[in-house]
Every structure is written in structure tokens, then in C-alpha cells.
Amino acid sequence: MFNYNKDFFSGVYEKSDWIVSETFNRCIKFNNIKHFKEELIKTVNKSKENLKLSLLTSHPELTGKIEVKNLTKESLSEQKSAGLNKCSIEEFDKLHTMNNSYNKKFNFPFIIAVSGLNVAEIIKNFEIRIENTYDFELNEAIREVHKIASIRIDQKIKSLDRK
């Protein structure tokens, strides 16, 4: 049974609560969390490209030696869990260089669901994905955004279960 309101899901999409709001406005009832997540994906997929790009550009770069000032608490926690706050100088330099190259090529930041990954795995994904075409990478970045949102939803629900 789905007993949540839209405010509960604030922050699941990085600085893009319009997705949750629009999904709640479009759908009267959700059967369960899986159904809700599917409807969130539909909301993004049906949105115009400028909204999709806005969603992507609202995500922070993977910074290594995390620069806290512009990160949401969710992003800060996720990047710390992947060890980005403890990366070596070489890893930091590589991430910085790759961020610049990726942004130059695609005009949005590299996005990956970092939960469960380490710095080496993130860099490997970076190296693979920077070779993608724009259209492929746009869709890949959006898939990663949905993974991040799904993880955040699950964490919010688990936090309720612990109370």
C-alpha cells in the first residue's frame, strides 16, 4: 500500500522536485513504490529536452576531495560513501580533467549512481562513457539519475521503518 505524500519525496531528484510534483498531479493513486518509481520515469521521459537538461545540470560534478558548498546533503552522503572525499591527488586530478572533458563534450556533468562503487570503478565508467555519442550519453545520464532517485526513495522508506 502506498501511504506517502509528495513532500516525503523531496530531494529524490537533485534540485528537481517538479518531477515528484508532476507525477503526483498526473497520477491519482499508486499501487506501490515500484509503480511510483515507474511513473516518475514516465514523467521525466515525457518531459521536453530542456527540462531533461535542467535535471542533468542540477547534479554536481563528482569532485574528489569533496567541495561541500554546492552539494545537497544527499549528494554529499553518496559521494562520501564512494570514497570521493578520500581520493588520492592523482585520482583528484584525473576526476577534474575528466569532468572538464566530459562537460565540454556533452554540456552536462558526468552522472553516475555512486552507491556501491569505489573511486577506481567511477573513473573506469567515466573513461568508457566519455566515448559515447551525445544522444546515447543523454539517455545514459538520465538512467543514472533514475537509479539515484530509486536509491534515495528506498533510503527514505527504510528510515521510516527504523523509527
Name the predicted role of every residue range:
Residues 9-11, 18, 24-98, 148-163:
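Aromatic-anchored, charged helix-turn/loop surface patch used as a conserved interaction hotspot
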Residues 18-19, 114:
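Conserved phosphate/anionic-ligand binding catalytic regions in large, soluble enzymes, centered on
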